[in-house]
């Protein structure tokens, strides 16, 4: 027998026939396909546009009428609930807020004070980060920190730095030694 050529596949056809005969019978689906109905205009021609422009304008007018009715109902129910509860609950002292749409009041409502506080905290947080970044890039951050350390430890201790590494504007304080009469410690401090 000759050796098969490299890169060619030889099929064992007897094995394939045996596998096909042992396969289980599968159920055939006899359900008809879903029919497709293209959109058609009133005149019978195919068109990608579903409705006429006038019908859309009518829908917009109906939507505006519905919004007005809902706003009136919401305003009257809020007036009734504030009068019936003896002044308890939410009530507005401003004339403008009372005349505004109730739907708009939901968006601006009672969360505005909370939202303002959140924005103030967020602004302060990012400003603090920006200030630290500026101080680090100018190097004055480390000078201020050393002055604070000197003032806090008093006259008995002296702060010395072993080494500073500058790489891409980022300064790290590797080790700080505190020298005093009885104790000395060395601990890495990253900023």
UniProtKB/Swiss-Prot annotation:
Keyword check for Cytoplasm: yes
Tissue spec: Expressed in roots, cotyledons, leaves, flowers and siliques.
Main function: Inhibitor of protein-phosphatase 1 (PP1). Binds to and inhibits PP1 activity. Acts as negative regulator of abscisic acid (ABA) signaling. Enhances the inhibition of SRK2E/SNRK2.6 by TOPP1. May promote the interaction between TOPP1 and the ABA receptor PYL11.
Location in the cell: Nucleus; Cytoplasm
Compositional bias segments (type: Basic and acidic residues): 20-31, 114-136
Listed Acidic residues bias regions: 93-109
Record key words, sorted: Cytoplasm, Nucleus, Phosphoprotein, Protein phosphatase inhibitor
Record-linked InterPro entries: PPI-2
One of the Pfam families matching this protein, by short name: IPP-2
Protein name as catalogued: Protein phosphatase inhibitor 2
UniProt GO cellular component terms: cytoplasm; nucleus
GO MF annotations in UniProt: protein phosphatase inhibitor activity
One BP annotation, GO: regulation of signal transduction
Superkingdom of origin: Eukaryota
PTM annotation, UniProt: Phosphorylated in vivo.
Deletion consequences: No visible phenotype under normal growth conditions, but mutant seedlings exhibit hypersensitivity to abscisic acid (ABA) or salt treatments.
SUBUNIT field: Interacts with protein phosphatase 1. Interacts with TOPP1, SRK2D/SNRK2.2, SRK2I/SNRK2.3, SRK2E/SNRK2.6, SRK2C/SNRK2.8 and PYL11.
Region listing for Disordered, in residue ranges: 20-52, 67-191
Phosphoserine found at: 45, 47
């Amino acid at each position: 027998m000759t050796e098969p050529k490299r890169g060619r596949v030889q099929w064992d056809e007897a094995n394939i026939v045996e596998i096909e005969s042992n396969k289980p019978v599968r159920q055939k689906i006899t359900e008809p396909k879903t029919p497709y109905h293209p959109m058609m205009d009133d005149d019978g021609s195919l068109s990608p546009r579903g409705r006429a422009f006038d019908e859309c304008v009518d829908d917009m007018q109906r939507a505006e009428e519905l919004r007005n009715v809902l706003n009136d109902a919401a305003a009257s129910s809020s007036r009734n609930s504030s009068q019936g509860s003896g002044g308890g609950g939410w009530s507005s002292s401003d004339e403008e807020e009372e005349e505004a749409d109730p739907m708009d009041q939901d968006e601006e409502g009672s969360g505005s004070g909370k939202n303002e506080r959140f924005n103030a905290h967020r602004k302060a947080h990012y400003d603090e980060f920006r200030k630290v970044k500026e101080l680090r890039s100018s190097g004055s951050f480390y000078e201020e920190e050393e002055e604070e350390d000197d003032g806090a430890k008093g006259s008995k201790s002296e702060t010395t730095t072993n080494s500073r590494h500058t790489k891409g504007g980022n300064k790290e304080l590797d080790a700080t030694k505190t020298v005093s009469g009885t104790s000395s410690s060395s601990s890495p401090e990253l900023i």
